[in-house]
């Protein structure tokens, strides 16, 4: 398991699928960093904790490579007062379960 702390700022993106979901891009090569494509993580969005997964939802980077994302729940967006288009600070560490 990778114990590295990943920390970055990102713009909240609006999902084009579903009912108004939102996400941030994970700007690292997930397979190179973790050795797999889906990674369970402890994350924080502007300090608000969240347990979820970094996943491939079929989104592509401009160069055509796979874009991995981390979803942001509406409840968390409400707590931190941020919506799609806003910049947030994210911390991520891998979790076992």
Locations of regions flagged by a protein language model:
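Long, compositionally biased stretches
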Residues: 1-67, 84-97
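Short alpha-helix capping/helix-loop boundary micro-motifs
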Residues: 29, 72-79
